[in-house]
Every structure is written in structure tokens, then in C-alpha cells.
Amino acid sequence: MVFRIASSPYTHNQRQTSRIMLLVLLAAVPGIAAQLWFFGWGTLVQILLASVSALLAEALVLKLRKQSVAATLKDNSALLTGLLLAVSIPPLAPWWMVVLGTVFAVIIAKQLYGGLGQNPFNPAMIGYVVLLISFPVQMTSWLPPHEIAVNIPGFIDAIQVIFSGHTASGGDMNTLRLGIDGISQATPLDTFKTSVRAGHSVEQIMQYPIYSGILAGAGWQWVNLAWLAGGVWLLWQKAIRWHIPLSFLVTLALCATLGWLFSPETLAAPQIHLLSGATMLGAFFILTDPVTASTTNRGRLMFGALAGLLVWLIRSFGGYPDGVAFAVLLANITVPLIDYYTRPRVYGHRKG
């Protein structure tokens, strides 16, 4: 009898990295479409800029490292990094910001560690945080959803603002950010945090046009539901596992509910947390990154729960209105520790 000796891994996933990345890119279509509908063509321009920047940055580093450029670019990971960063920033942010953030994400946060599979932090979120800390005004200058907007920029206007800072008619970001009440608009989370700190009551805040949505913030609720739809499709395709999204959303909802019940005059209701900002994008497309997330099922549950708790804490008590990016990176730090204490016991060996 002949015994074959094989080395690990002993189980194999037949799906290639490029196919998984492609599935994630396809799943992002509903979310992208929703952002285009509510915030205009700027999102598409940012995606194109980020995609080109990501591919060029990755190709440059691979060339310097004398590695195969074509083979690596085919894994679609650079495209996904650019896409996730592009949909996370305001649609009319200056062109150089998305280029800078994408190049930093690909070269510093990914390739500097050795490339795909070696980076401990989510590259897109590293790029986002670098931009947010460096350029806080531009990174929080979101347009009002078209439902409550006074000026809705077209495709040409979006290009002109992104590359020159103003439209052909002289309109700038201050003009484009005006809502139907004549006040510059912000995201639902940003508006809530700023208004509470200014001493406004929750009853007053909920009367603002940005909260005119059926469930949560105008426009943002549908954007989040679109990302949720894409995430459910990823689960159905088995491109991601359910542990991280579920534990993240349950923890965020639980913390938000308890906080709202105990302090309804200062803390946002759970539906605002779940359907505003980057909640669903983070739950299904960012936290589930197989490279930077936990690798065990118990670990994934802990990882998602930790991220959900951090998002609520940052949104409720921190200095930034959303907090998803910071929560992801802080949770990434804990992955080695989580994996160490949740790794399954080797058969035939005692626990401990």
C-alpha cells in the first residue's frame, strides 16, 4: 500500500483570488448606482481616477520589485482598493485627493508589507484615514442628496468642480452644498453630532431636511440598503461569510438601542446608525476583507462585534461623525490576538 504525503493546506477553495475580487466588484454595483443617483456623477469620476491610480501605483511597485506586473494586476485587488476608497470620499473632492489616497493605500499600506496577503491593515481604509486627518474639510464636504438639493451638478459640472474647484457658471462647493432650507448640508451623522454639541434638541434635529427619509437620513438610507443588497448577494455567492457582517450589525444595533434608550436627548436612534454613513459598506465590503480579518469563525464573530462597538463609540463620543474606517483599523490590530485565542484545537492534542 502506498501512502501519499502532502503538506498543508489540506482543504482547498477552488475559487481564485481574481474571481472573488470580481464578485465583490460586481456586488458593489447597486451601492455605486445608488450613490450616483443621490449624489451625482462625481462618484463615477472618483472611481475612474482611483482605479487608474491604483493600477499605475501597483504596476510601478511591481516593476521596481521585478515581479510580474500582468499576473498580479489580474487579481483585481488593486481595482477593489481604489473602488472602496472612491465610494468612501465626497463625490466632488479634488482630483488630487483620491489620487493621493489611492497611491498611499496601494504603495504604503499594501505593497510596502509585501503585497496582497501580507498587509495587516485594510489598504483602502488606511488611505481614507490619511486623507481625513490631513484634509478634514474636503473629506467632510458631502453634497446633499438630490431630494433636498437646490443645485444638482451634471456630469460636466462634476468634472469641472473635481479638477478646477468650480463649475463653468462660477458655482463652487459652497453653492452646491446648499439644501432646500438654504443651509449647507452634511451627512446625517455629522449633522446630528454637530447639532447636539450646539445644544439643539433631538426633536429639533429630526426636523432638518437631511432626516426627511422614511427610515433614516434622506438618500443615505437607500444608499445603505443598496450596499446591503450587494452584501446579501455576496453571501449567496459564498464570496464572504456571514459571521462578521452579522456580529457587526447586531452589536452596532444593540449598542445604539441601549444608548438611545438611556440618553435619547444626546444619542442617535439605532436606525440612523444602521442606515447612515458607511455602515453597510463597512459590514459587507470592508470588514470582510479576508487578508485583514480574523480567520476563525469564533474570531470573525469577535472581530465584527468589536468593530460594531468601536463604530458606535466613535460616532457617539468621538471627534469624527462616522468612525467606520477607524473602527476597521483598530479591529485589524487585534486580529493576531483574536486568532491566537480562537484557533481550533489540533486533533489529538490537549487544549491549552
Curated annotation (Swiss-Prot):
The chain crosses the membrane at residues 20-40, 42-62, 78-109, 123-143, 148-168, 214-234, 242-262, 267-287, 301-318. It comes from the Bacteria. Its main location: membrane. GO terms for biological process: electron transport chain; transmembrane transport. Pfam families: NQR2_RnfD_RnfE. Its EC number is 7.-.-.-. GO terms for cellular component: plasma membrane. It is found in: Cell inner membrane. Keywords: Cell inner membrane, Cell membrane, Electron transport, Flavoprotein, FMN, Membrane, Phosphoprotein, Translocase, Transmembrane, Transmembrane helix, Transport. The modification FMN phosphoryl threonine is found at residue 187. Part of a membrane-bound complex that couples electron transfer with translocation of ions across the membrane. Required to maintain the reduced state of SoxR. NCBIfam families: PRK00816.1, rnfD. This is Ion-translocating oxidoreductase complex subunit D. It comes from Shigella flexneri serotype 5b (strain 8401). The gene is rsxD.
